Each structure stands twice: as C-alpha cells, then as structure tokens.
Amino acid sequence: MLCLPVFIILLLLASPAASNPLEKRIQSDLIRAALEDADTKNDPRLLGLVTGACCAVLKFSFCCGKK
C-alpha cells in the first residue's frame, strides 16, 4: 500500500515537468535581458548615416524621402 504513493512521488520528481531551479533562473535572466534589449532606442545619428549612404550611393527614393 505504501509503495504506490512513494512510486508516484518519485515519478513526479523525475519527470521532465519538474523544473530545474538553475534552468528556471537562466530562462528568467534571458527573458529579462530580451525585454531590456527590446526597450533600447535607435541612435538618430546612426540612422542618419544609413539613410545618407542609401541616398548617396544607391539613390533609392525611399531612402531620401523623395516621392
């Protein structure tokens, strides 16, 4: 009678659904870092250089803002 509950508890502990604390901490750190990266702002100088190079070298109208 006592064997079945002990077997069930051991099965639950060994199952893949039992989370590893280290893995859980790494996942939460990665999620937090991704959210911080998503919140960064673009540097207007860098965007100006890219659009300027696109307009000067490639002469695409959508880069220069001309219609």
Curated annotation (Swiss-Prot):
PTM sites of type Cysteine amide: C64
Alphabetical keyword list: Amidation, Disulfide bond, Neurotoxin, Secreted, Signal, Toxin
Gene Ontology terms for molecular function: toxin activity
Entry annotated with the keyword Iron: no
A GO CC term attached to the entry: extracellular region
Cellular localisation: Secreted
PTM entry text: Contains 2 disulfide bonds that can be either 'C1-C3, C2-C4' or 'C1-C4, C2-C3', since these disulfide connectivities have been observed for conotoxins with cysteine framework V (for examples, see AC P0DQQ7 and AC P81755).
Propeptide residue interval(s): 20-45
Record flagged with keyword Disulfide bond: yes
Expression (tissue specificity): Expressed by the venom duct.
Signal sequence, renumbered to the chain: 1-19
Domain of life (superkingdom): Eukaryota
Principal place of residence: secreted
Name of a matching Pfam family: Chi-conotoxin
This protein's domain notes: The cysteine framework is V (CC-CC).
The family this protein is said to belong to: Belongs to the conotoxin T superfamily.
The name this protein goes by in its record: Conotoxin ArMLCL-012
Species whose genome carries this gene: Conus arenatus
